[in-house]
């Protein structure tokens, strides 16, 4: 970890850079008339709602007692089309409460950053802040009896109440010494969460953070890197934490030009994947070279009997390359299986499915172990945020080498779906998949529950939400009794 003097110097420099970036961001305003992430299906919601009389088609499984939560960017006030990036918009969480076979409510609430509190005319939310921004907009999950909204690159987690209200910006009771991540992964054997965290103000190191089942940080290990890589996600196996050090890195030029998301494709950055023993040191990391690409999301990983490590990922050919600066863009996103050889320090890549896809999820009771099924959202080649056409979900049988498709039909756009196992499950796919599906024609949204073992069949239940929920980022099921 950095010394107090280094931390103070970095904070001063960060404030100075932020001031220059803010000035140039104001100069961008008015230079662009439109932004696909501020209009059409992405047009932000303008109010917080609580709806209790929800129309249900089908039957909600009575075993489901908890909240489905999903978060995403949703500006709380006017946003400049020229200066807005989807990854940095104000966070809004959407939730549906299920109990006893009923949908008790839908709610949406902004995450109270300082900017959101000002826009809503409210006092600032309590709790300390970290990094250039306190916007939190990328993931939401339950851990240690609390609900947490998460972001990467410096911001602290935000603790939410049962009705999704912001309680506090909370570095896990003061035990977290730097920023966190949007993607911690829970070890199903120990209940610990593992995370690889990076800071926008620290270009030469990332951190391995371990969170106890009680919600307190028990380990923070600094790991040297170069160029400030954007590490959105990681993965765990029985013995390792997998680090994705890939060629999207911090760009001072982009920051100083006023663009709020200062990460760009860097062809000069060495692409590599690290195997960190869970209790090891930075010197113990085994770095394996991989052909240049970018991965937002691995699905799962595990170790083989011969000492190799399997990692299944959605691999973008490039990311944040070229002229598009409003959000993610790549031409190809196949689902791949990577085999990491810690002896040869190499990665071999095999395409499981060449069709574009994202948001891969397994049955997370199998996290870090050999598994059979993976679920993902179709992402057509050349995806256009202004005219999205991703109507399908995929189910991969990795043992049989087959794929099933659930197509919601033209004008019905699913996001990430999460697998929830049946309490009495014996088979890996005995459970439900759940997520939001936007109905473009009717400016509405359905919360859909699919039977995972009847993937191509009709939904088990569909709950109508009578407004359009803008496409978001990540969601999770938070059971009332974990």
Question: Each PLM stretch: what is its role?
Answer:
Residues 1-482:
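Beta-propeller domains
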């Amino acid at each position: 970890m950095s010394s107090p003097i280094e931390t103070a110097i970095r904070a001063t420099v960060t404030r100075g850079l932020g001031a220059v970036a803010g000035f140039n961001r104001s100069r961008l305003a008015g230079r662009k008339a439109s932004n696909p992430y501020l209009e059409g299906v992405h047009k932000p919601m303008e109010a917080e709602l609580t709806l209790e009389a929800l129309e249900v088609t089908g039957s909600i499984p009575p075993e489901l007692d908890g909240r489905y939560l999903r978060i995403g960017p949703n500006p709380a006030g006017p946003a400049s089309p020229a200066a807005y990036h989807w990854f940095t918009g104000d966070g809004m969480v959407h939730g549906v409460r299920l109990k006893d076979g009923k949908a008790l409510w839908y709610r949406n609430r902004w995450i109270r950053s300082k900017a959101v509190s000002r826009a809503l005319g409210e006092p600032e939310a309590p709790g300390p802040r970290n990094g250039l921004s306190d916007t939190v907009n990328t993931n939401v999950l339950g851990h240690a009896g609390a609900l947490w909204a998460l972001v990467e690159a410096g911001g602290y987690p935000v603790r939410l109440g049962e009705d999704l209200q912001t309680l506090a910006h909370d570095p896990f009771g003061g035990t977290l010494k730097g920023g966190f991540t949007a993607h911690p992964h829970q070890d199903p054997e120990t209940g610990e969460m593992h995370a690889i965290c990076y800071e926008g103000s620290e270009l030469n190191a990332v951190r391995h953070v371990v969170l106890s089942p009680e919600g307190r940080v028990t380990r923070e290990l600094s790991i040297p890197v170069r160029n400030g890589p954007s590490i959105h996600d990681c993965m765990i196996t029985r013995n390792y934490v997998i680090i994705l050090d890939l060629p999207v890195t911090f760009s001072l030029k982009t920051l100083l030009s006023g663009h709020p998301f200062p990460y760009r494709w860097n062809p000069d950055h060495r692409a590599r994947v690290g195997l960190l023993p869970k209790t090891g040191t930075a010197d113990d990391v085994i770095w394996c070279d991989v052909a240049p690409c970018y991965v937002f999301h691995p699905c799962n990983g595990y170790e083989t009997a011969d000492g190799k490590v399997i990692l299944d990922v959605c691999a973008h050919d490039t990311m944040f390359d070229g002229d598009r600066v409003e959000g993610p863009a790549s031409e190809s996103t196949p689902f791949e299986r990577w085999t990491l050889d810690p002896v040869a320090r190499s990665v071999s890549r095999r395409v499981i499915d060449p069709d574009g896809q994202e948001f891969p999820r397994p049955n997370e009771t199998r996290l870090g172990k050999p598994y059979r099924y993976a679920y993902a959202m179709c992402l057509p080649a050349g995806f256009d945020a202004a005219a999205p056409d991703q109507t399908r979900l995929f189910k991969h049988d990795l043992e049989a080498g087959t794929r099933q498709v659930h197509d919601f039909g033209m004008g019905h756009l699913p996001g990430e779906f999460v697998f929830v196992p049946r309490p009495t499950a014996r088979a890996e796919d005995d459970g439900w998949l759940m997520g939001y599906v936007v109905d473009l024609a009717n400016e509405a949204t359905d919360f859909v529950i699919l039977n995972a073992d009847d993937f191509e069949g009709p939904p088990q239940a569909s709950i109508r939400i009578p407004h359009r929920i803008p496409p978001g980022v990540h969601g999770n099921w938070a059971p009332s009794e974990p």
